[in-house]
Amino acid sequence: NEAIRDWCCHPADTFYIIGSTVGPHPYPDMVARLQSIISEEIKKQLLEKEGRDYPDYLIACVGGGSNAAGTIYHFIDDERIKIVLAEAGGKGVDTGLTAATIQLGKTGIIHGSRTYVIQSEDGQIEEPYSISAGLDYPGIGPIHANLAAQRRATVIAINDDEAIEAAYELTRIEGIIPA
């Protein structure tokens, strides 16, 4: 927030650079394009291992949205692929301690962008909650908001306990320690 305030107050010598697909145009698109290397790599590896360059499903977590945008970038228009966006459900979507912005957010303005925002009845941005510091953003990028609005993506909320359980299972079964 402070960085964005400084940028707004000093436009002549301050440049807005963020690693998430949020904020005003053209930043969400720039970040998505830069992160698109993820979907390029997915296509390449699938072609090598499976003989086709598209998956059946893409499942990605959504907070600031950069990893999800990179994962789906080269597949967005391919209707064969089902896209699932997993939001940080925190203690539960109905508890008030959540970061499930797509499911609970209402149209508002955050960081120079009109999108879904977790906010009070009078439009004040509320503090989201998640065990994952990288997923507790009170807004959502325009790419993901649009995918949800068009029903191109299925949106689910994963609560903290489910996320921890999945992390342990991934480590135990695959030997991958999630970030």
Regions found by a protein language model. Give the residues of each.
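Active-site nucleophile and cofactor-binding loops and adjacent substrate-binding regions
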Residues: 35, 58-64, 87, 157-159, ...
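Active-site/ligand-binding loops adjacent to catalytic centers
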Residues: 2-30, 77-80, 85-174
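Short glycine/serine/threonine-rich phosphate/pyrophosphate-binding segments
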Residues: 61-72, 93-94
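Conserved acidic residues
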Residues: 14-16, 56-59
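Short, well-ordered alpha-helices that flank and scaffold nucleotide-derived cofactor binding pockets
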Residues: 44, 73, 77
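Phosphate/pyrophosphate-binding loops at sites that engage ATP/ADP/AMP, CoA/4′-phosphopantetheine
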Residues: 44-53
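A glycine-rich, Thr/Ser-enriched phosphate-binding loop motif common to dinucleotide/cofactor-binding enzymes
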Residues: 26-41, 179
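N-terminal small/polar loop signature for handling phosphorylated ligands or for N-terminal nucleophile
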Residues: 4-5, 39, 43
